[in-house]
UniProtKB/Swiss-Prot annotation:
NCBIfam families: PRK08105.1. Keywords: Electron transport, Flavoprotein, FMN, Nucleotide-binding, Transport. This is Flavodoxin YqcA. Probable electron transporter. Belongs to the flavodoxin family. MioC subfamily. InterPro entries: Flavdoxin-like, Flavodoxin/NO_synth, Flavoprotein-like_sf.
């Protein structure tokens, strides 16, 4: 089974809740999973030939939460090319604001730039439609786990 790092960017804790639910699902499927809240580039690089799941909310005018900005900046500046990396993104946001789910899409664009292979589509979770984000994220994680298993 796969080694999966879940990297979280959260402001109010919803992204962490989604990440913990994803961790449970993936562990139940036999994967080795670790959640990182204030991740460093070093912890990310441990997975550069493995699989990562980025779970992040959006804050301000479409920015990433402070907890994941240092990782994003370090990846952009020093992450290098990572063609062996497989990943997924769960983006949380509120559709009543401009730049809905932009934080997750920023991270997705960066991972595309560094050559990583996305498994499946980015999941956009709208707080307006889904005040309990795990209702939509858990089925997505199950389907994403199928893609991970197929690798």
């Amino acid at each position: 089974m796969a080694q999966i790092g879940i990297f979280v960017g959260t402001v109010y804790g919803n992204a962490l809740l989604v990440a913990e639910e994803a961790e449970n699902i993936l562990k139940d499927r036999g994967h080795e999973v670790k959640v990182f809240e204030d991740a460093t580039l070093e912890s990310w690089l441990d997975y550069r030939e493995q699989t990562v799941l980025v779970v992040t909310s959006t804050t301000g005018q479409g920015q990433l939460p402070d907890s994941i900005v240092p990782l994003y900046a370090a990846l952009r500046e020093k992450g290098g090319y990572q063609p062996a990396l497989r990943y997924g993104v769960i983006a949380l946001g509120d559709s009543s604001y401009p730049n809905f789910c932009a934080g997750g899409h920023l991270f997705d664009a960066l991972l595309q730039e560094i050559g990583a292979k996305r498994l499946g589509d980015v999941l956009d979770v709208d707080a307006v439609e889904h005040p309990e984000p795990e209702v939509i994220s858990c089925p997505w994680v199950e389907a994403w786990a199928d893609l991970v298993d197929a690798q």
